[in-house]
Regions:
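Small-residue (G/A/S/T)-rich helix-start motifs and N-terminal tracts that mark the onset
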Residues: 20, 29-35, 67-76, 80, ...
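Short beta-strands and strand-loop turn motifs
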Residues: 58-60, 85-93, 120, 138-143
Length: 167
């Protein structure tokens, strides 16, 4: 999206194995700026299947483990990159061995550097990350229901759910 809008951007994070290599090659072929931390484990894949009647099935592999050295390298790179950007977008679930507050740490670093942190994640990671007050979150209907415990079946219940969690 940033590329299409002619905005400056850089994709970063963790990539490893054949899938990571494939993704980096595709990004390069499509002239998408990137600078990833190489990890020892294989990057996971996520496959979404939509049937003609609109039902969706998601096949989601478990994510790779990230070791302390890889995490430290990323945090160093992230902190350096903060001097070149105004907005950070973090998206997706965390690798299973990173702490639930990892996005919170990234939010704190962004805030310290007067940058806006936008977050698209779900579940306990989202719940934990809210404690750090990211500038923007992008929960979908299911994620709002999970976060608030309120079943959303109309615009009114949607508003009620949001107001109950974010008065």
């Amino acid at each position: 999206i940033c590329k299409e809008l002619n905005e400056n951007y850089l994709a970063t994070g963790f990539l490893g194995g054949k899938i990571g290599e494939y993704l980096q090659n595709k990004l390069t072929q499509n002239h998408i700026n990137h600078d990833f931390i190489s990890i020892k484990n294989e990057t996971r894949t996520c496959i979404n299947i939509t049937t003609p009647d609109g039902k969706q099935t998601e096949i989601l592999e478990p994510g790779p483990s990230i070791n302390k050295e890889e995490t430290d390298l990323f945090l160093k790179k992230y902190t350096q990159l903060l001097t070149y950007t105004d907005i950070i977008v973090a998206s997706g679930s965390l690798p299973n061995n990173l702490p639930l507050n990892f996005y919170g740490t990234l939010t704190q670093l962004a805030t310290k550097h007067h940058k806006k942190f936008l977050l698209d994640t779900s579940g306990q990671t989202l719940k934990e990350s809210l404690k750090y007050k990211p500038f923007f979150i992008k929960p979908n209907k299911d994620e709002i229901e999970q976060l608030t415990g309120i079943k959303i079946d109309s615009l009114d219940t949607f508003k009620d759910a949001l107001q109950s969690r974010f008065p």
